[in-house]
Amino acid sequence: MIKTIIEFFSLLTPSQRRRFYTLQILLVIMTFAEVASIFSITPFMALVGDPSILQKEGFLRILYEKSNLDEPYKFIFYLGFVVLAILIISALISIFITWRLAMFATKIGVEIGDRLYSHYLNRDWLFHTMKSSSNLTEKISTETYRITHMFLLPLMYMNARLFLTLFVFLILLVYDPIVSIICLIVFSITYIIIIKLARARLEINSKNISAMFLERFKLMSDSFGGIKEVLLLDKSSEFKKSFIKAGNKLAYSEGLNRAIALVPRYFMELIGFASMIALVLYLIANSKGNLGLLLPILSIYAIAGVKLLPALQQIYNSIVTIQGNLSAYESIREDLININMDIEQKVEDNQQVWSKHNEISLKNITFNYPHKKSFALKDVSLVIKPNTTVGFVGTSGSGKSTLIDVIIGLIKPQQGEITIDGTPLISQNLRTWQNKIGIVPQVIFLTEGTISENVAFGIPQDLINHEQVKKVLKLAYLEEWVLGLENGVHSKVGERGIQLSGGQKQRIGIARALYYEADVLVFDEATSALDGITEKAIMRAINDFTGKKTLIMIAHRLTTVQKCDKIFMMNNGSIVDSGTYQQLLKKNEQFKKM
């Protein structure tokens, strides 16, 4: 556990570590304040029990003489107010520093979530094809919450109680070494035995909690994402059973962890009170009838016990809570390491200025996906002239979409070179190249926002250029439909565009690509899921840009690529033929069958 904590703090930012070290100084101040409050009561109680102490040698006599008070009881009265003031100041200091501890831990948790979110968004397309969005969401929302409330906060509180426990023990050690050492041995051995016995169960529960949180996230994502199929196929009961089953496992693991953390408290309180009774009996037996001497001694041990027992329980509780949630850190450990590496390796865009007329050239492009034996692309070479319309056809799995992902910079090939107007496409100029591209996929992702927010995707509402929105909606043949809506471009589209037809979604996708004034438009089977009439309407909108922009189209149906200047036919990751629509019809039998 200690190695994990050290590693975790090594992955924090320098600013976060500085804040942590500052808090340790505050914890020392809080410890002094609490110790002062504890041991200010002891001399006061001794004086109340025996006012004659003022006549004996000691610091109370010095204070009494300097106070110029003529009555011992007046001195005791004012001393009581001083002790009360010390207690109030100590409480205020503890409240403030405890608040700072909580704010630090929660702030760190939020910042870790922010870093993870930013890290995942900055990862390449291949990363997201191999990762579950439910898993990423669960890490950002649930695991960072666990790190905040079940890892960092307990750690902060444990540190606070450790400082107090050590300081009080040192004072008691000076006051009575034998009793202090005996108490230390008894309490330490008891807690160590409990922690050793509970460790294995806590580790199992920790992993179960992470697994069940992820399972419930996945079930929610799958059931809500496919709600139409769930309702139609009457599968809601199966999802509910799985969700409840995972929830019961989660509740059992979390409940058992809490019980392991809380139950020993009563056993330790029993030991604590038994020790106090034994101490009282021991002091009575050795007081020789002078019970008045016992009051200050009992006061110091009683007050120390009141502070130490909860402190020891807090330390134990924190250790158990941290051990029971180490899986939360383990689940994001690799990501935090990668984040630090990303910061060191960040690539600056050189702001390459591409010409308006972009000739796209691919030379000997080869690529295969991780953990796949066969090549997705194999020695592909082609040239796309500016402001031409090209199509890619082929059976499923022939490499069409992968090739487009290479052209638009989502995938980096293992071999070969891509050039734009003769300039190699590299990391430093990739961003500016992608700024010139608009893509219309087969399935248009729509947020649960307005039409204008979906057209100007990713732009805050107050920064949207509504004139540009209206312009591109007109180009996408959506103007008439939008004008017929009560709220126009401010109309909501529903979650994932559920209130729109397939054709309307595709047109919004086209408008989105045009909003950013892209010079290259990519249509990735954009009409394959549409009926014939709607497809013709969409193709009319697309064909309006012929000769004005570079159009790249992936298609299954040949009707989509009839007007292309050039068509590339693909099979098994290679270009097996190319030509115009009419040329391929004449010379390629496979093309005719498509």
Predicted regions and their residues:
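Transmembrane helices of ABC transporter permease
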Residues: 23-29, 157-207, 278-293
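Transmembrane helix-loop-helix hairpins at lipid-water interfaces of multipass membrane proteins
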Residues: 24-89, 172-180, 185, 289-295
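Loop segments that connect adjacent transmembrane helices in multi-pass transporters
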Residues: 129-135, 208-256, 324, 331-332, ...
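ABC ATPase nucleotide-binding domain helical subdomain, centered on the C-loop/LSGGQ "ABC signature"
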Residues: 419, 427, 434, 452-495, ...
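Helix-to-loop junction immediately C-terminal to a conserved catalytic motif
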Residues: 408
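C-terminal portion of ABC ATPase nucleotide-binding domains
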Residues: 540, 557, 562-594
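A short, proline-enriched helix->beta-strand linker immediately N-terminal to the Walker B motif
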Residues: 515-519, 548
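Cytosolic ends of transmembrane helices, especially the final helix of ABC transmembrane type-1 domains
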Residues: 231-235, 259-262, 306-335
